[in-house]
A protein has these predicted regions:
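Phosphate/pyrophosphate-binding active-site loops
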Residues: 1-60
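Short conserved micro-motifs at the rims of enzyme active sites and ligand-binding pockets
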Residues: 56, 99, 148-150
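Short acidic, hydrophobic short linear motifs in intrinsically disordered regions
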Residues: 92-105
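Short alpha-helical segments that sit at the start of domains
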Residues: 56-87
Length: 150
């Protein structure tokens, strides 16, 4: 993150610590009781390793989904720049509203609405909710990958 390669943490140790919280507490108690740090360090290193493995798997799945979605969108020469802009925005904001997306991307409401309809037609985006006149859309396949095991 310091060198600008990552914009956010790529793996989450806290998830695995919570998942294994009984073992976590047992090992911490053992450190307090006997001063045995080695077993704690081995446990923590295992958690880091598993978290890194999970991050690599998630990155691979997201990369494959990106490539699959780009293939569905079509050749860049046959696709509007707005469509690609909205698609790339979806990869950092997988739940959107047309108005807020238009504002965030400095595009017209109608241009974003057309891109959203095209993405729905290609099976990339789906309407998930409607709050009054505001429709909410999500990149469901992306969210499934990000939310696995939660």
């Amino acid at each position: 993150m310091e060198n600008g390669v990552l914009k956010a943490p790529a793996f989450y140790i806290s998830y695995l610590l919570k998942k294994n919280r009984i073992e976590y507490y047992d090992r911490m108690s053992e450190v307090r009781r006997s001063g045995s740090y080695e077993q704690w360090i081995k446990f923590f290193l295992r958690v880091i390793y598993e978290s890194a493995q999970d991050a690599v798997e998630t990155i691979n799945l997201l990369t494959a989904l990106h490539n699959q979605s780009i293939a569905l969108i079509g050749e860049p020469s046959r696709v509007t720049q707005t469509l690609l802009t909205v698609f790339h925005y979806l990869e950092t904001n997988p739940i959107i509203e047309i108005g807020k997306t238009a504002e965030a991307l400095s595009l017209s409401y109608n241009a974003v609405a057309r891109a959203v309809e095209l993405l729905i037609g290609k099976g990339i985006l789906a309407q998930t909710d409607k709050q009054g006149r505001t429709r909410i859309f999500s990149y469901k396949a992306y969210l499934v990958i990000l939310c696995k095991d939660t």
